[in-house]
A protein has these predicted regions:
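Bacterial Sec-dependent N-terminal signal peptides
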Residues: 1-21
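N-terminal module-boundary/linker segments of secreted carbohydrate-active enzymes
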Residues: 21-54
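Ligand-recognition surfaces built from glycine- and aromatic
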Residues: 22-30, 108-110, 122-126, 202, ...
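Secretory/extracellular carbohydrate-interaction modules
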Residues: 53-57, 61-177
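Surface-exposed coil/turn segments at beta-strand junctions on protein surfaces, enriched
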Residues: 65, 104-106, 202-206, 215
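Short tryptophan-centered beta-strand motifs in secreted/extracellular beta-sheet-rich domains
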Residues: 113, 207-215, 220-222
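Short, aromatic/His-centered strand-loop micro-motif at the edge of beta-sheets
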Residues: 173-210
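Short strand-turn-strand beta-turns centered on an Asx-Gly dipeptide
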Residues: 224-228
């Protein structure tokens, strides 16, 4: 990505004209996103822009016009998906149709969403299943991949935000050894899941919640509603040299028969 590139990608739940004004006609603007459904079906740019007429999108991905909400349904489905669990996600694409143009911590990124978990199934233990709502994913750049002598980029999530028992739970990657340096920083084996997880102060349950996630060199700030911000500013953040992209959705963490979850998105806005 060019250093001076400025991208603003907005999904406003309503309809857009070519001028960007909300109108009663036209598709939701998802030009800079790629969807992957529980069936394994994927679509981006021009194909995704017509999702409301796409028979593959229903019943997983649709617009609730009465509520002005983009609805993401997740339940186990037969198909070509190779995901471990039940994935229904939107992947940010700075260049429409391409996964190869992303952003670095130096360039930074801000994700703002308003969302609501409408329903969630329970497991045999009586507890609600959980889903990943938001994620910051990392991968090696083309240059880094070549430097490591690999054919495919190394990919791993930097940060995940789960809905778990009605709370938002934040999980991130940290260095196993803070003295790690050089190419070793780009190895999955150098990173582990932080045991010091964070939670929203209040139970969000099945109510609307606002989240603002800002990343820049050496710092991550997460704002949930009007709560005190969750701030990460340590060596693990400073030494994250992967390029990144945002993921938004409903990644249900189970494939149990009869499991399901519904998430409504009222606002998705990305700025770089």
């Amino acid at each position: 990505m060019k250093k001076l590139l400025l991208i603003t990608s907005i999904v406003t739940l309503g309809y857009f004209s070519m001028s960007g004004q909300i109108t009663s006609r036209g598709p939701v603007d998802l030009w800079n996103w790629k969807v992957e459904l529980p069936s394994g079906y994927k679509a981006s740019d021009w194909k995704l822009s017509n999702f409301h007429n796409d028979r593959f999108a229903a019943p997983f991905f649709y617009l609730n016009e009465d509520e002005s909400a983009l609805v993401l349904e997740a339940f186990p489905s037969e198909g070509t998906s190779t995901a471990k669990y039940t994935r229904n996600t939107l992947r940010e694409q700075l260049q429409a149709g391409s996964n190869d143009v992303n952003w670095t911590m130096k360039e930074g990124g801000v994700l703002e969403v308003e969302m609501e978990v409408e329903s969630m199934s329970k497991g045999a233990n009586g507890q609600y299943h959980r889903t990943i709502l938001l994620q910051v994913d990392g991968r090696t750049t083309s240059k880094q991949t070549k430097q490591l002598g690999l054919e495919k980029p190394v990919s791993l999530p930097m940060l995940k935000i789960y809905w778990q028992e009605g709370y938002l739970k934040v999980v991130r990657k940290v260095l196993k050894d803070e003295s790690t340096a050089g190419d070793a920083l780009l190895s999955k084996n150098s990173w582990k899941e932080d045991k010091n997880t964070k939670h929203s102060e209040s139970k969000v349950g099945f109510e609307k919640v606002r989240v603002r996630l800002e990343l820049k060199r050496g710092k991550i700030v997460l704002q949930i509603n009007d709560e005190r911000p969750i701030v990460y500013r340590d060596l693990s953040v400073a030494q994250w040299y992967f390029e990144n992209y945002f993921t938004v959705g409903n990644y249900l963490q189970t494939k149990d028969i009869g499991s399901h979850s519904t998430v409504n998105y009222y606002k998705i806005e990305v700025k770089h």
